[in-house]
A protein has these predicted regions:
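NTP-dependent small-molecule kinase module
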Residues: 2-4, 29, 139-178
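Hydrophobic anchor at the beta1->P-loop junction of P-loop NTPases
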Residues: 11
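P-loop (Walker A) phosphate-binding loop of NTP-binding proteins
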Residues: 14-17
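Walker A/P-loop
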Residues: 20
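ATP-dependent small-molecule kinase phosphotransfer cores
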Residues: 36-96
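A glycine- and Lys/Arg-enriched "phosphate-lid" helix/loop adjacent to the NTP-binding pocket
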Residues: 99-140
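ATP/NTP phosphate-donor binding region
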Residues: 170-239
Length: 239
């Protein structure tokens, strides 16, 4: 993860997830420019990605993708990038992303196919291979991500970036989008014992917990305005 003071935001995700939209939203929040790697590759090669696949093959495209992506990641002035959906297939790119702030734009398979079919994308020609790629890539996106953002929130990245400020290394943010409102859910080892509290979230602190968990963290998140104790078990859980 990059330093929260000078973050470089890298948007990853499957085809049709809204990576370019998210990159523009992040760039606006950080007052900088977004770079779409696929568009830059087209400029460098002088032809569309569709033509590169048809005339030169996927291998040529992947070589250019890796070269251009690594070049951008080596330059700190490029603060917001949108990668192609398959860029994470490169081990070199995955290694380079370890030091960046990675946002995974998570789109469900049905929505991705609906957005991509008939668009001319070379890897969205048939549903079977499309679904196979989706299933292959999903665990890689999840492993690389510092934040997981639903694709329907790709145009509202500023609050996600605020929620990640000060996040301890190795932790993740899942951005929950609900009918009643959006909020960050935090995952990470020993977050409670570190007394982590997002600086972007003000106001009074309340803890909602069950009896089994509460006894292990009697003073977590102090000072608290109050505690709400619920019965342990699945019957007490809601989304």
């Amino acid at each position: 993860m990059a330093s929260p003071l000078t973050p470089r935001v890298v948007c990853i995700g499957f085809m049709g997830a809204g990576k370019s939209t998210a990159a523009r939203s992040a760039a606006a929040a950080l007052r900088t420019d977004a770079i779409d790697v696929d568009q830059l590759i087209e400029q460098r090669l002088g032809k569309s990605i569709e033509r590169v696949f048809a005339e030169d093959g996927e291998g040529t495209f992947r070589e250019a993708e890796e070269r251009v992506t690594l070049e951008l990641l080596e330059r700190p002035q490029h603060r917001v990038l949108a990668l192609g959906g398959g860029a994470i297939g490169s081990q070199a790119i995955r290694d380079a992303l370890r030091d960046e702030l990675v946002l995974w734009l998570d789109v469900d398979l049905g929505s991705a196919w609906e957005r991509c079919q008939g668009s001319g994308r070379p890897l969205a020609q048939d549903r079977e291979s499309f679904e196979r790629r989706y299933k292959q890539r999903e665990p890689i996106y999840a492993a690389l991500a510092d934040a997981i953002v639903p694709s329907q929130r790709s145009d509202a990245i500023a609050p996600v970036l605020e929620a990640m400020h000060g996040l301890p290394p190795g932790s993740k943010v899942l951005w929950a989008a609900t009918a009643s409102g959006d909020y960050p859910a935090y995952f990470g080892s020993a977050l409670l014992s570190r007394n982590f509290w997002p600086p972007a979230i003000g106001g009074r602190r309340f803890m909602v917990t069950d009896g089994h968990v509460a006894r292990h963290y009697p003073s977590a998140l102090e000072p608290l305005a109050g505690r709400v104790m619920i019965m342990p078990g699945e019957q007490s859980k809601t989304v």
